[in-house]
Amino acid sequence: MLTGTFLFGAASAAGYQARFAAIDLATDEKRAKQLSFVVWGSTIGAVAGPNLMQPAGNFAENIGLPRLVGPYLISATTLALAAVVIALFLKPDPYLLANKSNSLDANTSSTREALSHIYRNPTALFAIAAIAIGHIAMVSVMVMTPVHMAHVDVTLSVIGLVISVHVLGMYAFSPIVGSLSDRLGRVRVIQIGLAILLLSTLISGFAQASDAYTLGVGLFLLGLGWSCTLIAGSALLSESVETSFKASSQGASDLVMNLAGATGGAVAGVIIGTLSYGWLCFAAAVPVALLAISSFKLKSESL
């Protein structure tokens, strides 16, 4: 189980990198919009995936396997299909074409070198901070909301609806977010995303566990704010690093993002266990607010 989960995690990490591949050949005027369409494509899987649980389980039982094997079979099949499609049709490699090279030898750097380069680059550092902090706020509140609602016996169908609305906010409006990022600028859309995240934590933090409507609004805004920080932050990162550090910096950003998410999920459990869901939401708002304040300094220096 541990090995399988590790391999699925590696596949997920590769999938996240697809958004960067989409902008290797993009112009400055359309970079965020093109990235956002890749993120928007996740909406299909996010909506269809949970609905395949039942038929996948039935299929597994029909071929003599445990019911819980079914979702893994579906996941393995779709991942294999994705790999085949990319291998056959993503030619020539957009990264190689963008750098007018047939090899990566002249354009690679290690993750450690990339992190060092980012640390010396305030704009790139802000971009990764926006991605990571948006992710940690989203994950920490999102994973504990079903637990919070279940404590007062809210039905699973209602909880599922709230999470579905959250996923809608995360992915469905990605093209709009990308277009705004191209028109208004990356930093401004990140600021908008941070403001939405702050609003969502306040709405969710003051909501009663039984108030599915208010929690749904809060979780929708949580997803939308995350979308803004991810899309605008990813575009800003790609633009702010040197070509030789671009690929490794993009990988480093996802490493930091997912470590932040894992930390947020772990800490969220401790906070809700010792304090309350409301305090969890307010705690998630703190790094968001601090980054929002620092963003105005960055924006003023870049003008």
Predicted ranges, named:
Residues 4-41:
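Cytoplasmic helix-loop-helix junction between adjacent transmembrane helices
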Residues 33-53, 256-264:
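Glycine-rich segments within core transmembrane alpha-helices of 12-TM secondary carriers
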Residues 53-54, 76-100, 294-299:
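C-terminal membrane-cytosol helix-exit motif in multi-pass small-molecule transporters
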Residues 55-77, 270-288:
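A membrane-interface helix-boundary motif in multi-pass transporters
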Residues 57, 172-186, 272:
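Helix-to-loop junctions at the C-terminal end of transmembrane segments
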Residues 91-128:
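Juxtamembrane intracellular "pre-TM" segments in multi-pass secondary transporters
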Residues 196-209:
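C-terminal ends and interior cores of transmembrane alpha-helices
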Residues 244-275:
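A late C-terminal transmembrane helix in Major Facilitator Superfamily
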